[in-house]
């Protein structure tokens, strides 16, 4: 039986990405000495849920197309508070918080890796099941 989801971030600067997850996001971790020596960290990322979005859809008369891909998003209870807290720890964000139908979102820069979406959901939460 499936017990959890393990996500991977491929980084051009793995030590910087790991430091961001450890020091800025404050995620607890285990060290995997078999994964490549000291500093190979696996993080506890909290509760999770998974949604499946179509690559083509029409909503409110607008057409949306997206290539097949996977996306990592971090959820929070209060996006304004979370953004301010993370900025205080050195996190950088692109643009302003945007209202979407499913929640409030902003893209967060991750050192050495692609951005991660931070959002305050406005949809039912599956991780509480």
Where are these regions (language model features)?
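Vicinal oxygen chelate
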Residues: 1-5, 28-74, 81-110, 120-129
């Amino acid at each position: 039986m499936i017990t959890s989801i393990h996500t991977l971030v491929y980084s051009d600067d793995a030590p910087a990405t790991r430091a961001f997850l450890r020091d800025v996001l404050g995620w607890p971790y285990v060290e995997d000495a078999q994964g490549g020596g000291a500093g190979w960290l696996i993080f506890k990322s909290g509760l999770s849920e998974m949604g499946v979005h179509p690559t083509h859809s029409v909503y409110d008369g607008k057409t949306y197309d997206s290539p097949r891909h996977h996306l990592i998003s971090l959820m929070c209870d209060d996006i304004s508070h979370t953004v301010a807290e993370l900025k205080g720890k050195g996190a950088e964000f692109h643009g302003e918080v945007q209202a979407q139908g499913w929640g409030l979102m902003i893209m967060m820069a991750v050192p050495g890796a692609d951005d991660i979406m931070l959002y305050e959901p406005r949809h039912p939460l599956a991780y509480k099941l």
